[in-house]
Amino acid sequence: QYLIESHRSIGVKYETKLNSHKIDIQLREQSFKINSKLIIRPWLFQFLVGDTPKYLSYLRLGDILVVGTPSDFSGELVDPIEKSISNKSLNLMINSFNGGYIGYVTDDKWYDRDDINTYETYTMNWYGPYNGKYFSELIKKIIEINEKH
């Protein structure tokens, strides 16, 4: 009886953080590489493929942070991003295909290499080099914003 009454006197506090946002992003003009010498011009790419929404989105629910990208986002980029998190209780999930599609986003070191001109790192990198670093930095900024709140 005493244990039950003592238990009821313990203060309980629940706190749930809930936040979401959509952030428009800027990218260079898109193109499609057929090979290292033949690249479809941006205006023709636009005519053939059309335009797509370009934004990052995030949802914060408690200690879970879900970041959506408009790409096929390389898992190789996730580990360095996770290591940048100072709040170790924050659980990060990065998702691809958040409503738009801009092609593959891979580590910049793989872009335009002659020895590995693969589908993912060459043909499907529609917006050119440096997007691996660019997206990683944007996601780190989203993490910083959410670590403060």
Region locations from a protein language model:
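Non-catalytic substrate/cofactor recognition surfaces at enzyme active-site rims
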Residues: 1-149
